[in-house]
Amino acid sequence: MFTIAANWEGSTNYVATVEKHKPLESQGISLTYANVLNKYIESPKWESRESGNIGYVDVSGTIKGSNKKIGVKIKVSPMSNDSKRVSIKPESITLNGNSPSTQAAAEQILLYMFLADQRGEADVAYYFD
């Protein structure tokens, strides 16, 4: 559900690419990663790194309304059949420094956050209690 191809245009600014990405647009939700993560993570720190031709964006901070630390890892990889497009998908989520989640769990957590934002919820701290 979160594996979506985006126009790449040859850029390597992984943070800007992920921030602008609307992973649920095909389902009528036009929120970007920046909209959601900046809303629910206190003073989020956006960082990127590369491993070969794959980029990773790490977003970390404290969940608003909570004292829990969160780390979101998003993978940006080239599409094998189209050099102008990339696949952007959640890799894992870490809470309070515990072991990273599975990709499926990361997708579920992010889906919940996107839907909460669409409903206008001020915070999602209760979800992580």
Place the predicted regions along the sequence by residue:
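Cystatin/cathelin-like cysteine-protease inhibitor module
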Residues: 1-129
